Design a protein with these regions (language model features):
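Short pre-catalytic strand/loop immediately N-terminal to key active-site residues, enriched for Gly-Thr
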Residues: 123-137
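Charged C-terminal helix
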Residues: 158-194
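Conserved phosphate/ATP/ADP-binding segment of small-molecule kinases
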Residues: 47-123
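Short, charged, surface-exposed loops that flank catalytic or proteolytic processing sites
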Residues: 79-86, 152-162
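Short, small-residue alpha-helix embedded
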Residues: 72-73, 134-157
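Nucleotide and nucleotide-moiety/phosphate-recognizing core
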Residues: 17, 23, 122, 157-159
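Glycine/small-residue-rich loop that forms an oxyanion/phosphate-binding "nest" at active or ligand-binding sites
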Residues: 1-59, 63-66
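Glycine-rich beta-alpha junction loops
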Residues: 10, 36-38, 70, 105-108, ...
Length: 194
């Protein structure tokens, strides 16, 4: 197994069991998509599960991918309102023991969508123009899946993030061509083929 992706672990016992297995089997290249809140802002994890995630799982994973509300929940801090606060929170998350943190800045009110990658070597900014589409359902999940899929092909997380973010930007740019259902639709995962 080259890479593992973990998504929403709602209960403390599940978080602890996954953390124990990661330790036991010394799993490498683990991407944790920190799904913790519904779009409405309602918590999807119990408070105890958030503590277990922070204390037991984060030190076992290679990369976490929080958006700004998720980072705030993990740190029990206010939501970052600008890139300076993103930098502070990204560094604080890295200090919890994971190898890397990708802070996603899509919740900022910028003309571009800035993301910051934090590693022991420093911080790297990645930007892309903000794409105005109603089809954004699953964007974070899609990005973490792309990161997990691309990691074995690239020498480090910075190169992996650059390729995954470029791919996701193209998938968002083509999302309106899908015309799938009503309401918030998906990004165009297959934009490279059709």
């Amino acid at each position: 197994i080259d890479t593992t992706k973990i998504v929403m672990l709602a209960e403390t016992d599940i978080v602890e069991a996954v953390a124990e297995r990661l330790r036991r089997y010394q799993v490498q290249n683990v991407v944790l998509d920190t799904v913790m809140l519904a779009k409405s802002g309602d918590p999807l994890l119990s408070p105890d599960a958030v503590v277990a995630l922070r204390e037991h799982l984060l030190p076992q994973v290679s990369l976490i991918t929080p958006n700004l509300p998720e980072a705030a929940a993990l740190l029990e801090a206010p939501h970052a309102r600008n890139e300076q606060e993103m930098l502070e929170q990204g560094r604080a998350l890295l200090a919890l023991g994971c190898e890397a943190v990708l802070m996603k800045g899509g919740h900022l009110e910028n003309a571009e969508s800035p993301d910051w990658l934090f590693t022991r070597d420093g911080a790297t900014r990645f930007t892309a123009p903000r794409i105005h589409t109603k089809n954004t359902h699953g964007t974070g999940c899609t990005l973490s899946a792309a990161l997990a899929a691309l990691r074995p092909r690239h020498p480090d997380w910075a190169a992996t993030v650059a390729h995954a973010k470029a791919w996701l930007s193209a998938a968002l740019a083509q999302a309106d061509t899908l015309e799938v259902g009503e309401g918030i639709g998906p990004v165009h995962h297959f934009h490279e083929w059709w």
